Amino acid sequence: TLSSRRDRQMTIILTPFMSCSAKLPIYAFFTSVFFPGKGALIMIFLYVFGILTGIIFALILKGSLFKGEPVPFVMELPNYRMPGAKNVCQLLWEKAKDFLQRAFTVIFVATIVIWFLQTFDLRFNIVTESKDSILAILAGYIAPIFNPLGFGDWRISTALISGFMAKESVVSTLSILYGSTQSLLMSLTTPAALSLLIFCLLYTPCIAAIAAIKRELNGKWALIVVFGQCLIAWLASFVVYHLILLVF
């Protein structure tokens, strides 16, 4: 509904910095395990951190890629009326149909790829242990990237990759790979857990959001968002992790 293409692009790019409901299970899980009794404080911190990151990045974009005078926002408010059930259903169907037609292909392909990587090993045999899957092997190569952030474990990398499909799957994947919260507690320090929460807050949104970005902008911008947010998440986690180590 934004008339300015500049404002519309910036809104689409910045929206993933905000916490969505799919990230709440991650927050709840880690706060209960690593920060018992301080869950509300950690939750508020994560929400505020995401908002501040979005504001800072918006100011950077306004001064670089999206320079220009802001378009005055004037909206004429219509007379409010109770919508009819038929109109509501028709509008919902049109929006859902449009999303499915444009985004379903991307979501379907990504789902198949993740399922395949989780199910088979390098010889294309069905795995009985998650650690033998292609996804776990790939995660093992990626894991060293996260060593400076305090969580260079292949199991966490596997969970983050699965989170690309749906953020809720991060918790379920960790539960399967670690087996118990005690194993997770032994694997991660408290600063590393907060660093991981920051990364989960800011790294690439799920495939459905990426498909929506591709639909509204284009494939190039979707890739920029994916890699850009991963870089921002890495830098933010690095700073938070090492600041905590310095202070405590």
Residue ranges of predicted features:
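Membrane-interface helix starts
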Residues: 97-109, 152-157
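Short amphipathic alpha-helical coupling elements at transmembrane boundaries
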Residues: 87-98, 140-148
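Juxtamembrane inter-helical linkers in multi-pass membrane proteins
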Residues: 67-91
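Membrane-embedded alpha-helical segments of transport systems
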Residues: 11-28, 45-54, 164-171, 201-205, ...
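Extended, low-charge hydrophobic alpha-helical regions
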Residues: 1-11, 112-230
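Transmembrane helix-loop junctions at the membrane interface of multipass transporters and ion channels
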Residues: 17, 21-44, 208-217, 239-248
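Small-residue-enriched core segments of transmembrane alpha-helices in multipass membrane transport
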Residues: 16-19, 34-35, 40-57, 128-147, ...
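Hydrophobic core segments of alpha-helical transmembrane domains in multi-pass membrane transport
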Residues: 31-33, 47-61, 107-120, 196-202, ...
